[in-house]
């Protein structure tokens, strides 16, 4: 992404309703689908300005990768975590080391999404899991996606196909950012009709509005963790390596969590 996008992210990711609400949803998902209850070794790929690291540290120790120099320096200063630079598959990582690898709105930036997941698979310890969050609904493609250097938006089927091709078995897949979907669709289509680029989406609204949107979005965690939303602006997915894929254990070997 461009430098100004990271700078803007650094300004808003602590308080903006989308970032706060998403962290609440992902916290619920991790509480339900982490591979075990004790402290985990976690890798965040594409940590950006570090807004997710404190949330992830609730579940264990966190390593992180971020290729952008500005974002990496900002994240390291704000979190105290040593963050590796570079791009997959060239970043040196230990094999069979991590209990949890997360890519939170990152996979859509990577031209070879399957190749990236294949490179990460052997880095998971036995029983380890992969957690993804990605933008959904290709029909919502807009100037916002272009500004953020997205390669694609996913459907449930295209995301699962990439995950399967990379050697993973899906344990839970859920849409989220569902309650605000009608409003977001309306704004995106209005911006398209008026030729706007959609930059207002990265601004924090007035405090009462921001507070309400934070509450509404974050409240989805109770439904999203069960995979009950049929559609949404985003998709989250939890997966594990399949038998013979070179890492971890398959669902047939006891690594699968309860499926609701």
Tell me the role of every PLM-derived stretch.
Residues 1-96, 100-104, 115-117, 202, ...:
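Conserved N-terminal segment of class I S-adenosyl-L-methionine
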Residues 10-11, 130-152, 156-164:
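Short, glycine-/aromatic-enriched active-site segment of Class I SAM-dependent methyltransferases
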Residues 105, 109:
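A short His-aromatic
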Residues 114-129:
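A short glycine-rich, Lys/Arg-flanked "PGG" loop and its adjoining helix->strand segment in the class I
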Residues 168-178:
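Conserved S-adenosyl-L-methionine
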Residues 180-244:
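A C-terminal cap/extension of S-adenosyl-L-methionine-dependent methyltransferases
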């Amino acid at each position: 992404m461009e430098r100004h996008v990271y700078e803007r992210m650094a300004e808003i990711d602590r308080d903006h309703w989308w970032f706060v609400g998403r962290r609440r949803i992902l916290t619920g998902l991790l509480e339900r689908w982490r591979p075990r209850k004790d402290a985990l070794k976690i890798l965040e790929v594409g940590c950006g300005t570090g807004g997710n690291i404190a949330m992830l540290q609730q579940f264990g120790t966190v390593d992180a990768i971020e290729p952008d120099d500005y974002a990496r320096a900002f994240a390291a200063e704000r979190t105290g975590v040593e963050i590796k630079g570079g791009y997959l598959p060239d970043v040196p990582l230990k094999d069979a080391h991590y209990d949890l690898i997360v890519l939170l709105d990152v996979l859509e930036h990577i031209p070879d999404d399957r190749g990236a997941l294949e490179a990460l698979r052997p880095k998971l310890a036995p029983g380890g899991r992969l957690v993804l969050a990605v933008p959904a609904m290709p029909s919502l493609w807009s100037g916002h996606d272009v500004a953020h250097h997205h390669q694609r938006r996913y459907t449930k089927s295209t995301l699962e196909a990439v995950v399967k091709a990379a050697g993973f078995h899906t344990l839970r897949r859920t849409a989220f950012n569902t309650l605000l979907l009608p409003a977001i669709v309306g704004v995106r289509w209005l911006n398209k009709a008026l030729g706007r680029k959609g930059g207002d989406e990265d601004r924090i609204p007035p405090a009462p509005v921001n507070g309400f949107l934070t509450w509404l979005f974050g409240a989805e965690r109770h439904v999203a963790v069960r995979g009950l939303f049929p559609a949404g602006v985003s998709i989250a997915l939890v997966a594990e390596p399949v038998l013979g894929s070179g890492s971890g254990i398959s669902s047939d070997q006891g690594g699968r969590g309860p499926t609701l």
